[in-house]
Amino acid sequence: AFSGILAEADIAAALKACAAADTFNYKAFFAKVGLSAKSADDIKKAFFVIDQDKSGFIEEDELKLFLQVFSAGARALTDAETKAFLKAGDSDGDGAIGVDEFAVLVKA
């Protein structure tokens, strides 16, 4: 799903680092997976991969399954992780993360 954007080895390392419940940290994850160093264009491409229903927003249910977009065998985020992730990214308070909000979150 992220071929041409992210390296498989970086994805594996990032997923391994947050394999235990309640250890997910979006800043650490985006840095480890290599996304925070990418161009605005690549970050936008990643957003559209994560936006599974193609609504133009990443909603709470998509955030919960965020890690599984990177690898099917990855765990779901806990409710606490999901809510913290949404709160960090949803700067306008509409309950979802838009493409511009996502870009800010990745670079945070």
UniProtKB/Swiss-Prot annotation:
Pfam families associated with the record: EF-hand_7
Domain EF-hand: 38-73, 77-108
PROSITE patterns named among the record's database cross-references: EF_HAND_1, EF_HAND_2
CDD domains according to UniProt: EFh_parvalbumin_beta (cd16255)
InterPro entries: EF-hand-dom_pair, EF_Hand_1_Ca_BS, EF_hand_dom, Parvalbumin
List of residues that carry N-acetylalanine: 1
Highest taxon, organism lineage: Eukaryota
Keyword Repeat: yes
Binding site for Ca(2+) 2: 90, 92, 94, 96, 101
Keyword annotations: Acetylation, Allergen, Calcium, Metal-binding, Muscle protein, Repeat
Binding site for Ca(2+) 1: 51, 53, 55, 57, 59, 62
Any one GO cellular component localisation term in the record: cytoplasm
Gene3D superfamilies listed in its UniProt record: EF-hand
GO MF: calcium ion binding
Classification via PANTHER family: PARVALBUMIN, PARVALBUMIN ALPHA
Free-text function comment from the UniProt entry: In muscle, parvalbumin is thought to be involved in relaxation after contraction. It binds two calcium ions.
Similarity field: Belongs to the parvalbumin family.
Miscellaneous remark of the record: Is regarded as an important allergen.
Name of this chain's protein: Parvalbumin beta 2
Native organism: Merluccius productus
